[in-house]
Curated annotation (Swiss-Prot):
Stated family: Belongs to the MurCDEF family.
Keywords: ATP-binding, Cell cycle, Cell division, Cell shape, Cell wall biogenesis/degradation, Cytoplasm, Ligase, Nucleotide-binding, Peptidoglycan synthesis
Subcellular location: Cytoplasm
Chief location category: cytoplasm
GO cellular component: cytoplasm
Native organism: Hydrogenobaculum sp. (strain Y04AAS1)
Molecular function in Gene Ontology: ATP binding; UDP-N-acetylmuramate-L-alanine ligase activity
UniProt cross-references to NCBIfam families, sorted A to Z: murC
Residues holding ATP: 113-119
Role noted for this protein: Cell wall formation.
GO BP term, pick one: regulation of cell shape
Protein name: UDP-N-acetylmuramate--L-alanine ligase
Biological classification of the source: Bacteria, Pseudomonadati, Aquificota, Aquificia, Aquificales
Length: 449
């Protein structure tokens, strides 16, 4: 009754992957949706096709006649639409609060962690879909199962990524929480690593008495907080865990491993995606699916048919005898995982990482981790930092990393044109474009030139 009072939603920054997902769900629920962003992209095109009114550019008049205004964390406090909405007395809420409201309407599974959220959420969603559970899904990427980052299901089940970057994951009323790992990330929001870990303690302890959290026991960050957890946890890992992967084999076309639960073999799993990190992601999805009482043969068959979300070790094509991949990874841990995954698949090829650093703050705080990593890779083409919404108050640049690496195989590339020329010189290599900024379309553009 009360929620029907509000029918007209406006999203400031609607083109973002998280904002667009919520907007799609509301459209499918029958609400009127409009939104603004600074540029067109594929998700905006999909929103238009679904019936959303989209404005390119922000303007105060865009919020007139709306009832609820949702804004993303990337939106400035002095954004003209945000200020006008407050002046008009409209309901103004953050993306995190809007997601929390969706969780109140459903029984939720929230997947968090510094790395692996999108793939783990995608796996759980795919298994649930194959099992006929008809979930509502919100993912930080385009899942090939649905061809979208959001799907409205008919059941009470909601499966969603939970964003720790701004602390909004603590607002979610979920029945099952997943923590894939806890790493040094989002230092611009959190005071330090200990502050990040405390947030995850609260997240895990947020589950109700009838719920549980599924956590990666092999991760040092997770292990360091276990003494502070007073709610039910289920662990997974390779070294140990309630759910454990053993007999792992990396082949050129698949990854195989056996799954054990408390010492008893449950299944033999075959994945079509490479990497030890995806074994961990699969273990998390198996643990959650088992909690949901999905039969083991269904889990096995679903994971065998699973295709990862776009920009997650996504194969783009072949050019000049080189294989081209694309990945969203922008943290040293993620780059290392992707590099090792491709090495396990292409043991005799050079892996060339084309990396666009994302945010000045992340580059500044993690520069030593980036430098140590780059020293160990076959070859790195390093682009300028993509600042996102940040000003460069840190005085940091990609050349600072180049100077610290001091390695011939780590090269600064100042432009896309020069990058493409340098890539054309390579033969029989695996090229992976990595980053969360404007590099997102470069791999496809290069493959077509």
């Amino acid at each position: 009754m009360f929620r029907e009072k509000f029918r007209k939603f406006h999203f400031i920054g609607i083109g973002g992957i998280g904002m667009s997902g919520i907007a799609k769900i509301l459209l499918d629920m029958g609400y009127e949706v409009s939104g603004s962003d600074v540029r067109q992209n594929d998700v905006i095109k999909e929103l238009k096709e679904k019936g959303a009114t989209i404005y390119i550019g922000h303007d105060a008049k865009n919020v007139i006649g709306k009832e609820v205004v949702v804004y993303s964390s990337a939106i400035s406090n002095v954004n003209e639409e945000l200020l006008k909405a407050k002046e008009l007395g409209l309901q103004v809420i953050s993306r995190g609060d809007m997601l929390a409201d969706l969780f109140r309407m459903k029984e939720g599974i929230a997947i968090s962690g510094s790395h692996g959220k999108t793939t783990t959420t995608s796996m759980i969603s795919h298994i649930s879909h194959i099992a006929g559970l008809d979930p509502t899904v919100l993912i930080g990427g385009i899942l090939q199962t649905f061809g979208s980052n959001a799907v409205l299901g008919k059941s009470e089940l909601l499966i969603s990524e939970a964003d720790e970057s701004d602390g909004s994951f603590l607002k979610l009323n979920s029945v099952i929480n997943v923590v894939t790992n806890i790493d040094k990330e989002h230092i611009g929001y959190y005071k330090d690593y200990e502050d990040i870990k405390e947030a995850f303690v609260k997240f895990i302890n947020n589950v109700p008495f009838y719920g549980a959290s599924v956590v990666n026991i092999d991760d040092t960050g997770v292990r360091s907080i276990l003494s502070k957890i007073h709610k039910k946890i289920i662990t997974y890992g390779i070294e140990s865990g309630d759910f454990q992967a053993k007999n792992i084999v990396f082949n050129s076309d698949n990854t195989r491993f056996d799954v054990f639960y408390k010492g008893i073999k449950l299944n033999t799993i075959e994945l079509q995606i490479p990497g030890i990190h995806n074994v961990y992601n699969a273990l998390a999805s198996i643990a959650v699916s088992t909690l949901m009482e999905i039969e083991q043969p269904v889990i096995r068959d679903a994971l065998k048919s699973f295709k990862n979300a776009k920009r997650r070790i996504e194969f783009v094509g072949e050019k000049n005898t080189n294989l081209i991949y694309d990945d969203y990874g922008h943290h040293p841990t993620e780059i290392k995982s992707v590099y090792e995954a491709l090495k396990s698949k292409y043991k005799d090829k050079n892996i060339v990482v084309v990396f666009q650093p994302h945010r000045y703050s992340r580059t500044y705080y993690l520069i030593d981790d980036f430098v140590d990593l780059f020293k160990s890779l076959d070859k790195v083409f390093l682009l300028d930092i993509y600042g996102a919404s940040e000003e460069n108050t840190f005085g940091i640049s990609s050349l600072d990393m180049i100077n610290k690496v001091s390695k011939e195989e780590c090269v600064y590339i100042p432009s896309k044109e020069e990058l493409f020329d340098r890539l054309d010189e390579l033969k029989d290599s695996v090229i992976v474009f990595m980053g969360a900024g404007s590099i997102g379309q470069w791999s496809h553009e290069y493959a077509k030139t």
